[in-house]
A protein has these predicted regions:
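Mid-to-C-terminal alpha-helical segments outside catalytic/metal-binding sites
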Residues: 150-185
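Short acidic/histidine-rich active-site segments
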Residues: 128-150
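Extended, charged catalytic domains and RNA/DNA-binding interfaces, predominantly
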Residues: 2-100, 104-107, 118, 122-125, ...
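Active-site micro-motifs of SAM-dependent methyltransferase domains
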Residues: 72, 141, 181
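Conserved active-site loop/cleft motifs that coordinate metal ions or position small ligands
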Residues: 98, 132-136, 171-175
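Outer-membrane beta-barrel pore domains
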Residues: 108-111, 142-151, 162-165
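C-terminal functional module detector
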Residues: 112, 119-123, 128-131, 169, ...
Length: 185
């Protein structure tokens, strides 16, 4: 069945305003009702693609928030990335944060590499989110890719680099176990 539900894709719709919407509104009344229904159905409410006001509306209502594919604004200013307060709020609510491999969300440099992915993971860990991290690659939504990470089979390259910084069991949590544990809500 459905495990995660995104309320919008970057712009406004009947539920919420997205990250690129200029009017700055949050969840609509209908959007709030949808989040309540997602709670009742034990489905993750995805904050990726929401603007900040919609994000905070979701955090207030949702029992199971997730940022399925978002990174750290502190490391790369992009409207789809999350600021420290948003990341901390997800961690506090025991939500998941799927680090995305979209190059423009990882670095302001011309080309992203595996070290950029690791940098975002390390930063989320520094905020207390080691048990909240997963991979939110978004390969189906991008044309440009991280050097040596263009398909899911290339996860090994990310895992090998992460193993230089973390125990293998922690890397396994990032890759798989954190998501599985969070699915048992």
């Amino acid at each position: 069945g459905v495990r995660s539900f995104g309320l919008t894709w970057n712009y406004a719709n009947l539920l919420a305003d997205g990250a690129l919407e200029t009017r700055g509104a949050g969840l609509t009344n209908f959007g709030k009702q949808v989040v309540q229904e997602l709670n009742a159905l034990h489905v993750w409410t995805d904050v990726s693609h929401l603007n900040e006001r919609s994000f905070w509306d979701v955090i207030e209502i949702a029992k199971n928030p997730i940022a399925s594919h978002s990174n750290c604004m502190k490391l790369c200013e992009h409207p789809r990335n999350l600021n420290d307060e948003q990341l901390k709020a997800l961690i506090k609510k025991n939500g998941m944060i799927g680090v995305t491999f979209v190059p423009q969300f990882l670095t302001n440099e011309k080309q992203a590499n595996v070290a950029d992915i690791v940098r975002h993971i390390e930063y989320i860990c520094s905020l207390g989110g080691e048990n909240n991290i997963g991979f939110g690659s978004d390969f189906d939504g991008i044309v440009e890719t991280v050097v040596n990470v263009s398909v899911y089979r290339d996860y090994e390259n990310v895992m090998n680099e992460l193993c230089k910084h973390y125990a293998a069991s922690t890397v396994e949590r990032f890759l798989y176990d954190n998501f599985v544990e969070h699915m048992s809500f």
